[in-house]
């Protein structure tokens, strides 16, 4: 994929509180006035700290921008800087604050803190190479370097650099931590050498010969010159052999010399090397960590300092100024925090009050917590990297992600990436943290996930007839295929697989625990459904693009006709959402009262049209939640409240079995209850005589309650026996009564 779009900005619209690093976001223009106003937005931010470019840096401050972007250039001024009393081309040290710009044969120089200006004219036949302070470096047709400077009368002085070996081909003009010198790398006799031009008199001196063309970095200041991990003092007598600095290799490089310290680190932030910025003393050989978690280039400044980026994450990524102290050491100070960078969303899922977003720019998956109304209530959270199949450009429905309502989400991954044929696939379940995944091999190619709940995920392969149900026990990294069947319209809700029957309108429920039929429903559909979805007691069916569609309520045995069409629809709790791919309207049909009432909740951008499943640029939370969609602004996702009351709290499936050794500290009892919507919970453990032994409380992860008991009573004692547990769950949305469940567990 070629789309690339950083840690999240989150806004709650219509609320008083705005989260840290948040900006209040208005309703997208295309969604007004026909659509509902979002209750909030989130912006997906890159989890990778960005490289920073410095268009200019000097004694009074610097300019920075995100590398490779069209973002504006930001200007930073150093606190306490005092401009010099005199500045100009006749005072080379004052050049540490000069900004040079070139247009054709003219170089304009401006002293940033005093506004003193000068203009240079590049002589005919010379090529501009570099600018350092009040000096500009050019090269004539013979390859000889020249130093240009403005004279008091407005003319340009031209000094030929002396001392470059005859026949040398200059390959690089290098700026360092000095306004008095410029570095030259040259090739002679097939070998590289490096040295300095003294800008005061134009004299060149070679300091290091036989430079490795792989390690040809050059760093210097007014004290030291370093090339190819060989260091020598600038004022050393001619012919002084450089000192070899051992023990360092690619991808570690040296960036700058500050005082007597060589700054060493790694450009990459992909785990190839130690991320710390190290200061190596060129006097003693000792090293110390100057900055932790520092990536990207360290850039020398002509005033002898340097700029580096560091921080624990992109959310706390900063520019540091490294300055020399009086004794030649290097000290760092934080100067400015770098703003995060929004990146595009390539997959979107919503379930149990959590919004999941995927970016193919190396971000992987992230999640955002939402409250009961759909408002964002937390920062962007890392949910792990991905081994996705490759996807066509512009298809935001690929890769697919399906929220499971228990804090996890599922996707399809292939053994290898093959755009034409795909690879043997697995269903990959992420979470509930960024490190835990469950991978189940399904063996088909180019398949998808039409749905899933908790531990069960439905997979449809691209091969004719392939349909499987994956059982991924929560908390385990091991799963299995529990059902392999001939493909029909089907859906998983809780521990039941609902599938089209053999006659028109017939839907059969299969228990995934017992593999037995638990229900046969006559929905009234005049066909064998081509699409079937189940949420709570609702069954949605469709007879195809040109046929009718409806919803059947298993509780009331009531059937409701709903809008049909060629575009995919998604069933949620009491409502159905369908995208009109002609008008790009996202339409919600509320059927919970038995009557179908349709309204437009969003108008989607006309670009990035999903070619496959309904997921990608919009998603619904079938676990008592709402609707999310891409606004068209890079990385931005809006959440709109469904306006439909959720069903009462109910259990979908559970695992409360006690281990063979009972509850222990090493192997605690870890029951799990999958509910149909988020809740807070209290788990009371009592003796059979009714005495309370322990009370545990918490909030569901998604819509799943997970508890852990080590067998100890509240007083810390362990008493063997059978204990009665009672789970009381209260719905987070305050709609409907609390749910109470009971059972037994053992302490041996």
Predicted regions and their residues:
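Short, compositionally biased P/S/T/A/G/V-rich stretches that sit at domain boundaries
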Residues: 342-344, 638-668, 744-748
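C-terminal tail/sorting-segment detector
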Residues: 554, 728-748
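Aromatic/hydrophobic beta-strand junction motif of beta-rich domains
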Residues: 62, 225, 539-541, 668-677, ...
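Secretory targeting and sorting signals
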Residues: 1-33
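A short tyrosine-centered beta-strand micro-motif
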Residues: 719-729
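Structural signature of eukaryotic scaffold interfaces centered on beta-propeller domains
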Residues: 47-58, 89-94, 127-130, 172-178, ...
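Glycine-centered tight-turn motifs at strand-turn-strand junctions
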Residues: 691-718
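Surface-exposed loop/turn elements that mediate protein-protein interactions on large endomembrane-trafficking
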Residues: 31-55, 61-95, 100-125, 140-168, ...
